């Protein structure tokens, strides 16, 4: 997983353009090739209250100081250029240049990430420690950038089919539009790719799984404009993957209601993990903003390791390949696999016999003791099969993950002691 991050990291991405397309192709190749369906929508297209912006092309950018030194070199770090900057080729004095520079005073050794998708302006991002050293004099500024009004916005999706006869879907959404930042950008798509590969390898799938790779905000708006009715009808739970590759925490941003299946299964799965943090929808920040908006109202939560904005490296050059790790990415993947396994096993069951079942005559008492060490789990599980509690409810009472009850449930079903409601 980390190797894929290293391959993607240097690419200059934005909400449109060649870098985004190149990154989609790399993700597709990581899945075996020909897996992702890549789509486009024309610049200028109306999508709800928004308009798809002109496609951005960036080739080079730098500043030449009065001493002849090249600084803010785009080819050294693509964060140096204001993302979606207009082109410029001119000379100006320091005071005029300062109006187009962005830095972080309390993080003097970091390059900030700044965008201007919907307002045409030019600019550079610079370490504050370098900014304060700038001398009076003439500066040459050069940005080789264009905005193509006849361009496109790209996105990709993948539908992994259920092995059962159902149209119910689980949505996995992630974004791919940030340039060289590791946790905020690459961790979500990488975890999504490996999650999809894992799902494709399962022999049985209760749900259909819809994976969406988009530019943040405008991409989810575009996707909803194309698929809103279908998603509203068939989505049972959804998960936005963001900032899911570090080692420091596990985080959940709830839906507005906090009572959907997505809220329930994510909380059940993550709450016992180290340094778990739970947030309300007031702390939203990624594409859950669109999926959970009032007229859309999809059951979608956001799953992170350390939540966006809660680590000082966020939206700076410090969010680099040292901030994520193979272990962090694997932890994010495992968390999502557990969420899926808990969803897959979840049903509402009802007992088929009065009082406690006789486990001994069905050889369940001995078998279960050997396998689980305690007979209490099987009796407690049956005790809560009241056609109201689902498996997630019962597993929470037993302080175990729902998927750990899978074999027990199969035994009870085989012996016709429970039935699905």
Region locations from a protein language model:
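N-terminal hydrophobic/helix-forming segments and targeting peptides
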Residues: 1-421
